Amino acid sequence: MTQATWYFDVISPFAYMQASRLAELPDTVELACRPLLFAGLLGHWGQLGPAEIAPKKTFTFQHSIWRARRMGLDFNLPPNHPFNPIRALRLCVALDDLAAIQSVFRAIWVDGHVPDNDAGWAGIQAAAGIDDGDARVADPAVKQALIANGEAATAAGVFGVPTFVIDGEIFWGDDAFDMVLDYLADPAMMATDAMKGAATLVPSSERKR
């Protein structure tokens, strides 16, 4: 079996889209779904999120609307974004079940339930088929697991969501899912001189910071 780790944050519309394709993974893959806080990745790498740059935020959501339509996915923007995803992420940790995680994604990106207000949180719990979400997300072990997921991700070089890590290789973004499938069919594709050269490309100029 090939071990694949999928890092995601429910705050990302593209993670929702990639979640819809996970059934396309071959049966030889053992998938570990790892929720993490995208904001933690941004802080670690010193980046701004796409929603923190006004014109980028607009295009990101226009692109997500277009992409979902192209994929034939139900998709609606939530009433607020960015929102605080912590409760939903901890719930995904606690549930530890792909179908339940997908129900959380749909609650946010189809039904418009955001986890940082009580009505939205109730809607997310209902979508997941539970009514004890507060107790589940308050579990110290769940809280620590979410933190550990973020630490493992940054240690692996993950810088965005959604991201697959397979055999130490990073595949970032919903639009890299076909690359994931190609790699699983032919792992040698990442061992070519061209692919290996991407890691050693030297800059001739750097911007001032």
Where are these regions (language model features)?
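Structural alpha/beta surface segment adjacent to cysteine/selenocysteine redox centers
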Residues: 10, 14-111, 194-209
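C-terminal cap of thioredoxin/glutaredoxin-like
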Residues: 3, 11, 17-29, 103-209
